[in-house]
């Protein structure tokens, strides 16, 4: 196994940019999205110092229940190593229920990640996405399993669960709280975020944003993780 693969397995596999996102179960038919998101650790400890990652993706919802998404570039700088591109990903969101049809709205996520780091395995991810809206308050839960595949793969499943609770002051301002837990490395984090959407006048286009900071709940998590996301949507 190369040094790069070892670093990916021992540090990068514990947290990637797609670990710090709470996926929505909703699909908007015919909408195209271009998204950039990432994170940066703010922790002087050697196993977290200068760690950061980012990824850019494009998606298009061909129908009202399926949204495929391609991650064109996934960048990572693991603590103690140089930054590099680490692979690509094909992700699918399936909306399983109509919004408001049942007590909660349900979707499903399924993805395949191809790693370009020599000696590192690919991975599949899957799991349910659940959202409950009550008035202006929305709560979203993700339950995601990850399994390494192909050469060098571990036989174990890794599990993470995520939570987002936001209050809609206006379309452009939704303050809230996000929480993340990864049982594979016992890292638990939670903190405030602000999100929103701006409609571009006289168009069918929108610009979404999300920024926040996660605080480490236990010693296995970074003390602070800064998050940022921007998304351009159009029909």
Task: Kindly give the residue locations of the regions a language model identified.
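Bacterial N-terminal signal peptides
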Residues: 2-10
């Amino acid at each position: 196994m190369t040094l790069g693969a070892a670093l990916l397995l021992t540090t990068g596999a514990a947290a990637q940019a797609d670990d710090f996102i709470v996926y929505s179960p909703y699909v908007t038919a015919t909408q195209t999205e271009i998204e950039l998101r990432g994170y940066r650790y703010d922790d002087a400890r050697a196993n977290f110092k200068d760690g950061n990652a980012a990824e850019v993706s494009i998606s298009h919802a061909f129908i009202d229940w399926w949204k495929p998404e391609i991650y064109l570039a996934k960048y990572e700088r693991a603590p103690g190593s140089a930054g590099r591109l680490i692979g690509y990903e094909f992700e699918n969101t399936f909306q399983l229920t109509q919004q408001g049809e049942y007590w909660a709205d349900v979707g499903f996520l399924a993805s395949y990640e191809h790693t370009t780091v020599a000696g590192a395995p690919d991975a599949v991810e899957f799991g349910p996405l659940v959202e409950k809206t009550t008035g202006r308050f929305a709560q979203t839960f993700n339950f995601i399993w990850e399994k390494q595949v192909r050469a060098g793969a571990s036989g174990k499943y890794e599990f993470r669960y995520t939570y987002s609770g936001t209050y809609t002051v206006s379309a452009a301002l939704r303050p809230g709280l996000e929480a993340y837990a990864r049982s594979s490395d016992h890292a638990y984090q939670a903190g405030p975020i602000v999100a929103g959407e701006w409609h571009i006048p006289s168009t069918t286009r929108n610009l979404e944003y999300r920024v926040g900071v996660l605080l480490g709940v236990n010693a296995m998590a970074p003390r602070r993780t800064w998050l940022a996301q921007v998304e351009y949507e159009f029909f």
